[in-house]
A protein has these predicted regions:
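Conserved metal-phosphate-binding beta-hairpin within the catalytic cores
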Residues: 230
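Extracytoplasmic cell-surface/polysaccharide-interacting catalytic and binding patches
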Residues: 21-102, 106-225, 235-249
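Bacterial Sec-dependent N-terminal signal peptides
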Residues: 1-29
Length: 249
């Protein structure tokens, strides 16, 4: 081995050692764990009422849902700003907003899926799905492996009547699995025309329309199967499903 070859091998060895011991860059957080674009709803809409059902045991599963560490509600900044406009609109009509759920981590969705596959667990059937067989919940899309809530711009909510100091009567409870929860139950939600029926009253249908119109006026789109469910039309993360837990930011 000549002198030149020896020097080249030594230089190569030093370069390899330098690469091995060089400080590695800090890993960037996975997109689904990054909370940068999210806010506490109460920081943007301070007079909103929170009743986070999945932090409690009063929900269709009957236990606190995975990923809900605190009884708070999170949304993307864009969705929260639009919700503030909704709140201001409805306050002029005598209502406040009451939120049941907003951003939902993937762990919560996975919890629903596990529960749905356990056909023997029907503890809350009489409260939320008395007319449905549990083995049909996936077929009818009541439960799915992904949820729009995990994208951060979807929420479930109702009206709180400031005059009566009670929730407005919507003709059905949040998370009721059945046709009674559909916005078109009892009328045409596009025109707001009530249709006489034995399921919901004209007043209940009108209350649903008050919420629906206010949400749509300020950039949210409704969901055909749930009167309480709305998604920001121009959501900032349409293809990202986040996984960080629900807790104060």
């Amino acid at each position: 081995m000549n002198k030149l070859t020896t020097m080249m091998l030594a230089a190569t060895t030093l370069c390899v050692m330098a690469a091995c011991y060089a400080k590695k860059p800090e890993p960037r957080p996975e997109p689904e764990l990054n909370t940068t674009g999210f806010v506490n709803i109460t920081d943007v809409v301070p007079d909103v009422i929170l009743e986070i059902r999945y932090f409690s045991t009063y929900n269709f599963v009957g236990s606190r849902i995975d990923g809900y560490l605190q009884p708070t509600a999170l949304l993307t900044r864009e969705a929260a700003d639009s919700l503030r406009a909704v709140s201001d609109d409805l306050k002029e009509q005598g209502y406040r907003l009451k939120i049941y759920d907003a951003y939902r981590p993937q762990a919560g969705v996975d919890h629903f899926v596990r529960w749905g596959k356990d056909l023997g667990d029907t503890a809350m059937k009489c409260y939320f799905y008395p007319n449905e067989c549990k083995d049909s919940l996936f077929i009818k899309d009541y439960i799915a492996t992904h949820s729009g809530h995990s994208r951060g711009s979807t929420l479930d909510l109702t009206l709180f009547d400031m005059r009566t100091e009670k929730e407005a009567d919507m003709g059905g409870t949040f998370d009721w699995f059945g046709l009674e929860s559909h916005p078109d139950c009892g009328g045409n939600p596009t025109t707001g025309t009530y249709r006489q029926n034995d399921t919901i009253t004209a007043e209940q249908f009108a209350n649903r329309m008050i919420l629906r119109r206010a949400m749509m006026r300020h950039g949210f789109k409704p969901y055909d199967c749930e009167w309480w469910h709305f998604t920001l039309r121009n959501e900032p993360y349409p293809d990202t499903y986040f996984g960080f837990p629900v807790r104060e930011l």
